Amino acid sequence: YGVCILSAFTITAGFLTRPSAQESIETVQTSKASSEQNQEAVATPNNPQSPPSNKQVARITASGDMLYHDIVYGSAFDGTSYDFKNDYEQITPLVSSADLAIGDFEGTINPNEPLAGYPIFNAPEEVIQSIKDAGYDVLDLAHNHILDTGIEGLKYTANAFRKNGLDIFGVKVDPSEGILVKEVNGIKVAILGFAYGFNGIEATLTDEEYNNHLYDLNMQKVKQLIQRAEEIADFTIVLPQMGEEYHLHPTQGQIDTYHQMIEWGADVVFGGHPHVIEPTETITKDGEKKFIIYSMGNLLSNQRVETLENIWTERGVIMDITIEKENGKTTLTSVKAHPTWVSRTEIDRSFMGGPAYDYQVFLAENYMPGGPLEHTVDKKTLERIQSAYTEVNKLLNIKF
């Protein structure tokens, strides 16, 4: 979405960026994931000779854009309050079971500005509770809509998530903030987010404001941050936002940039921005497997075949990886994909004089033959969900 206003920017690797300022990369935010996991094998009566092991294991999930169009939040309004509890109910068991769940919130939450759902995105603060209830732990705010309600909106959005017990990355409220590091079952996981641009609104900022609060794809700074993350953490995850919207395959710029991130030290790259899913790639570096998904698509939005004539915009994926740390070395040991589909059902309520809808993110595997929810939807809907499952997996083409 959006246009770009040219100002005092430089071009770096094809992206508009501000002149580089000294980047704060020393601050480490560390917290403990909520789930408990046995981290050490001990001798048992049945196996008295079991040697001790220092292996630590963590499961991490990540998903695509949470995009609250006006009809999405408008449909959740009953005249007095907003209720988003249905949005993620079906994916909650999967997301909440992860040791670390990463979400991508695209837009702002700023009660001092009007609600908006395109081309400016400003959602009600009530969306946070449904995101938290689904089991998400951290939210990526590095995207082209984070300045939609100004620097004030950026700060309010970040602080609102933090106030509700969720961490954020990809922006800074305070210039002294550094790399987010989550300690997950004894494994230190660094998480970084970068955006290709900010819809031209960045032209209204001073250089100081820009450098104090935003992470763009200035590759010199990206390299510096990834290398620093590798020094202070066991495992590095990067969520870049770039690419061509609604294209099912990455641009050469995405390929080059994400490969460079792996070369600099990223272990996993979870891409976003195109609003559709794009393929995956497994890279072997120094004998270890690294993983890229070029785009995770949308998790929740009003984009779909009925609104855009593009069926891929209603399809998403929850990536599910396992990492292990043993003898001081942390590796990626498994990668799974869980395709999703956005259900939109008309409800007995109006929005701006038109229909309103109940939105739910369905976990497509539940509707496959033999799945627990196979017989809970009509035939046409079932075919749409099953096609999403099959075609998403085919496009992702995971080879790990």
State the predicted function of each range.
Residues 2-14:
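Hydrophobic membrane-insertion alpha-helices, especially the h-region
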Residues 12-32, 36-400:
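Acidic, metal/ion-coordinating pockets
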